[in-house]
Amino acid sequence: VYGTLGDTGVFSELSPYAPNSPYSASKAGADFLVRSCFHTYGMNVVITNCSNNFGPKQHDEKLIPTIIRKALAGEPVPIYGQGTNVRDWLYVVDHCSAIERVFKSGRSGDTYVIGTRNEQKNIDLAYLICDVLDAQSPKSDGGSYRDYISFVTDRPGHDFRYALDPTKIETELDWHPQYLFEDALANTVEWYRKMYQFS
């Protein structure tokens, strides 16, 4: 909902909304609707804005499942542009714990940004996933899954960088992620590898 960042800076609860796609505009619109119900009717609401989620059971067409699925199938792994777009990745289990904390303890009418300060370029993320696959399910020819990475034309409206400052939820609600990114990513790769029936 906040739009895109350049090479520096972070989004916080004080950042203005600046959605750049119909998808993000619909999310911003939902936030405005909820906020208006609080101000008009006193409805007990809280709003959360999160960084990119990952973990088991995510839709197959999302970035991380796509990288895993394509690599295991020996197909080209598509990476938009040069892979320099940056995302702050949030493990789904940590996201759920944050939502629960906000639901139980957040101030009515307030917004809480949920992130982990874990920025990754898409290409670096793809390399990490391929390295995990190399360790968990080595290729029979001894090669690396990195060999399947293929750069494709960037998609329209692709925001360059997202980075969130979770200071408010950390200080006011004492929430912190419980999983290290590398461990959560390895767990995620293993889950998809088993789901796709690659041992």
Predicted features and spans:
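A short, flexible beta-alpha/helix-coil linker loop
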Residues: 52-53, 85
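Short secondary-structure boundary micro-motifs
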Residues: 53, 61-62, 145-146
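C-terminal substrate-binding subdomain of Rossmann-fold SDR/epimerase-dehydratase oxidoreductases
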Residues: 65, 71-199
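Catalytic helix-loop patch of NAD(P)-dependent Rossmann-fold dehydrogenases
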Residues: 1-47, 54, 58-60
